């Protein structure tokens, strides 16, 4: 109710509710119970994208297991936006470093995007939060590598740090 009341009306359905579902073994994510009332009030579908690094969310199969382990798919419908390709390429004509981004193609199935995020220190980006959720968060696995690599996905961990930040 808080989100809808603050906005002054309902979000246009269908609503994608972008969350960080949490990495396996990591406690630094907001738990489902905290977000549940807002998700229910929005009437939305929980959405996520696969990661570009090894772990419990780097493939669709592993990510589905993580979503189940953390309770997301038990209580809500979940859509992995990049579960199946091809990625959706979005142009960024005024981008300082990159001129396009690759996002999960299922994002076109939604008329509204509600971003639920936490604020944290991030080893590469300085701070993570809502803006990071809108760039890297909705990027496909390839898109995440593309952003981290400042347009060269193969340089995901070796690109110039400032170029990475400007890409995000």
Feature map (PLM): residue ranges:
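N-terminal and secondary-structure boundary signal
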Residues: 1-168
């Amino acid at each position: 109710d808080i989100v809808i009341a603050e906005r002054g009306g309902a979000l246009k359905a269908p609503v994608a509710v972008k969350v960080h579902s949490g990495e396996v073994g990591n406690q630094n994510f907001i738990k489902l119970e905290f977000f549940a009332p807002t998700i229910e009030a929005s009437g939305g579908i929980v959405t996520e994208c696969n990661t570009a690094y090894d772990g419990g969310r780097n493939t669709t199969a592993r990510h589905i297991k993580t979503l189940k382990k953390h309770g997301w798919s038990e209580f809500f419908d979940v859509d992995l936006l990049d579960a199946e390709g091809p990625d959706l390429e979005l142009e960024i004509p005024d981008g300082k470093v990159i001129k396009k981004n690759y996002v999960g193609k299922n994002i076109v199935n939604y008329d509204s995007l509600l971003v639920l995020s936490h604020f944290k220190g991030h080893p590469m980006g300085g701070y993570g939060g809502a803006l990071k959720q809108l760039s890297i968060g909705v990027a496909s696995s390839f898109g995440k590598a593309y952003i981290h690599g400042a347009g060269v996905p193969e340089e995901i961990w070796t690109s110039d740090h400032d170029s990475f930040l400007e890409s995000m």
